[in-house]
Amino acid sequence: MRYDVVIIGGGLAGLTCGIRLAEQGKRCAIVSAGQNALHFSSGALDLLSHLPDGQPVSQPLDALDELARQAPHHPYSRMGAAAVAALLPQVEALLERSNISLLGNHQQNHWRMTPLGKFRACWLSPADGVTRGLADSHFGDNPLIAGIEGFLDFQSRIVAGTLQTQGIAARSDELKLPVLDRLRQNPSEFRAVNIARLLDRPENRSALVEELSLLANGNDAIIMPACLGLDSPEIVSELADALGKPVLLLPTLPPSVLGLRLHQALSQRFRQLGGMVMPGDRAVRASLSSQEIAVHSHHHRDIPLRAKHAVLASGSFFSNGLVTQFDRVTEPVFGLDVRFAEQREGWSQQDVFAPQPYMQFGAIVDEHLHPRIAGETVNNLYAIGAVLEGFDPIVQGCGAGVSLLSALHVAEQILKEGNP
């Protein structure tokens, strides 16, 4: 099977790169092992919330020079501030073309509410999320935090209590919703995605509206767990119209409706453009030459995927894009050079809340995001997203930005080579 580009990994980075290439007529295939980090995400996208020294960032573009000084191996530093600034509007436009409704812009971080009622700096938030610092932020002065009876993945009392400490007159209550009684009988099935599949049905809408209107009498907004709007945020806006007040969603424990919705929108866009996705498959090895890369997958061992270019978007330890052994960290498909601490004692810190060194382990790349094998740069192979070295997506608040920007950066490199 022959393609222009083979992408290993079907998460945020892989899909974004594939969409951009497919928009320009490239024939792309994505080998996706299964669930990715989007299934566990809040649906919000961060760009840069903190520098490595802990300094908070409000205007990410203004912080790129200092980031390069503190973290020269950070993917943004590798790409360069000028490239990052040029790509950011393109990222936002690509997401809009993919029919993804987001609030925010790259000039200024805003704040999104976490599942515990606290606020975290953010670049782009779901249109039905709870935000602060945007013209469209509207979670009210006395919101109702509406939980769901028996649903343990969202604690409305904790959220309301946290908001009260911030001077917001929030209160909590729980929806009974008899339509969910069958799900309640099996706690392992009483999860956000399964609830959303029921609440998104038109025949269940009136019961939801009726109960919410009773609970929220006297409240100026409703904040509830993201247990509806699996396929589209329009369901949430229709509910808000019926109630006459804003209805906003907070992410729950995984699997995340907001993250799944983002993944579905990107996957649909890629397929609409003619892209091929091989779900449930896994790249196991590859052979390289200067003219072609052949990728062998678990289900197609004897029939490799051949392409002039390959893009590794396999993620970090979470998705086995990086693998640890007792004394080293490896990249299992290509055997890329990986930067990691030589002494295993330096891989982590005892304090679980402290920045963990292993989070910054990853593939060594140049400014074009070409990786190395045994010290030699491979010019028709690229690495993007969480497999890259030099950044901590949690502490620095830059995981989504690295995935999106590195994906477009590499797509542009491939397109330039095809159109000199």
Swiss-Prot record:
GO process annotations (BP): glycerol catabolic process
Root EC class: oxidoreductase
Enzyme Commission numbers on file: 1.1.5.3
Pathway named in the protein's UniProt entry: Polyol metabolism; glycerol degradation via glycerol kinase pathway; glycerone phosphate from sn-glycerol 3-phosphate (anaerobic route): step 1/1
Superkingdom of the organism of origin: Bacteria
A cellular component annotation (GO) from this entry: glycerol-3-phosphate dehydrogenase (FAD) complex
InterPro entries: FAD-dep_OxRdtase_2_FAD-bd, FAD/NAD-bd_sf, G3P_DH_GlpB_su
GO molecular function: glycerol-3-phosphate dehydrogenase (quinone) activity
Name of protein: Anaerobic glycerol-3-phosphate dehydrogenase subunit B
Species of origin: Pectobacterium atrosepticum (strain SCRI 1043 / ATCC BAA-672)
Lineage: Bacteria, Pseudomonadati, Pseudomonadota, Gammaproteobacteria, Enterobacterales
